[in-house]
């Protein structure tokens, strides 16, 4: 619980519980430094973001939350409120891998609402995941990205990581209670394939300990892992298999024979230590593939996207190309200030921390693949997806771990003994997108022509996948859904077409409003013309009649009463109710064209209550350690 603040003590005094003197209050504040420093949501509010596109700023919060007071351990988060609500309120927590790689990769290069056009200009991400879900990016473990901890206090094991993450969530929900009832999905990629199942298990254990109504059980509704490092025992041997399938190495060649020797050594190490997460001898297979497939220009395969090449020995460490803009942007002083970065953190943002990676060896942790069966059997849906051009955490290893895993009374994607769930062809807007496979609460999606970072390559397709998994229903907000089909069948509308700054539904509504307005203006114009013609006719009649009268009564001054009454009636009609034809257009009809969900704020509590500045005008809602990368 949050510590008592002066304002809340005042409300207690009003209720007659206690009468505290000013002297006692001052002493309390003096000897309770944490009381004076307790933060509120307003302290995390992002009031501006350098380089953001024109228009209202998306609602966001960012900053540090302490998870280890003894060692000054703090986790950094960046939260975006969703742009629209479909049928339920959802929050997606996103984690990148490493270990020790910042989730700002996900925020600015994959699923976040913005991408960098250059190192000082942001543009909207066409396919961002914040369309129907709040996004919470967290730099973890401590020491990663903008997160920090005292030197020599980095953590080592997966259970330490998950315990600190639960502490983070407890404190985060205290700051932002309006989101605590959301459906929660934990998503990420690469080495986050180890983190996510451990966090999911810790959430379940935390929920099971709740005995009263003083705490809220968190609604964990699913986990999503892309190109995950989940089962090293399957992933290490898949390097050579993948290299054969993609034509990186020719089977039967002298190189292949040499690599098979390394493969044999690796398999013996796995047999001796089947639960090891990091095996040095197995990493040698990947290193040899990269080193011995260089071209004449010393260009090696990009281990994250084998369609590309990179200078040796980087072999993908310079990828993706957006990195050249992300790093200088996140190191800008004005950006650091805007994101409420603790000024005591002296070091600037780094994509991946070697210190975190080398310390987090998980030597005493079981690989997360062993947690998946229990999670599935407890009712937690799991989505595993892979880009087919990734080498380091390739789809061959993911498919092998699924085939070997037993859960809910079957092995792999068995639907009955010896019968396997079919692979369904997926097309997106008329183009082959990949395959879907499902059995007993587990979904697998293979993306065609995608790298280690699928949302980086295919943002809209990945959003479509997410919407389907979360069962987003856009029927109540209208709009034309994306043409996404499984085996040629267009399933329920779960994803909208892409638009840089809104949903296609909203754009369509705006176009419909504009069309209605023009029709109304045309009607009003026609009506006004008729009124003018009538008025001119009446006025002409009045002039003609007046002149006749003046000729008959030239000796008498008389104000023409008929003239006044006709003009008054004419002006009254102009200023009073519109004529029948113009009245057919009612501006309230325009309001009805807006679906209630499109322009509605997410939560009444969260709109401006967290911005306490009286001058604030809230915006309208409107080895390898790498990007999300794995260090096998």
Curated annotation (Swiss-Prot):
Polar residues: bias regions: 492-506
Residue positions the entry lists as glycosylated: 19, 119, 126, 441, 449, 501
Superkingdom of origin: Eukaryota
Disordered, as annotated region: 480-509, 574-632
Catalysed reactions, semicolon-separated: Preferential release of a C-terminal arginine or lysine residue
GO cellular component, one term: membrane
Enzyme class (EC, first level): hydrolase
GO molecular function: serine-type carboxypeptidase activity
InterPro entries membership: AB_hydrolase_fold (IPR029058), Peptidase_S10 (IPR001563), Ser_caboxypep_ser_AS (IPR018202)
UniProt key word Transmembrane helix: yes
Alphabetically ordered keywords of this record: Apoptosis, Carboxypeptidase, Glycoprotein, Golgi apparatus, Hydrolase, Membrane, Protease, Signal, Transmembrane, Transmembrane helix
Segments on the Lumenal face: 39-523
Residues that span the membrane, as ranges: 524-544
Membrane topology: Single-pass type I membrane protein
GO biological process: apoptotic process; proteolysis
Stretches assigned to the Cytoplasmic side: 545-632
Active site residues according to the UniProt entry: 190, 390, 452
UniProt EC number: 3.4.16.6
Major location (coarse): Golgi
Signal peptide (UniProt feature, chain positions): 1-38
Subcellular location: Golgi apparatus, trans-Golgi network membrane
Record field: compositional bias (Acidic residues): 581-590
Residues forming coiled coils: none
Record family assignment: Belongs to the peptidase S10 family.
Protein's recorded name: Pheromone-processing carboxypeptidase kex1
Species of the source: Aspergillus fumigatus (strain ATCC MYA-4609 / CBS 101355 / FGSC A1100 / Af293) (Neosartorya fumigata)
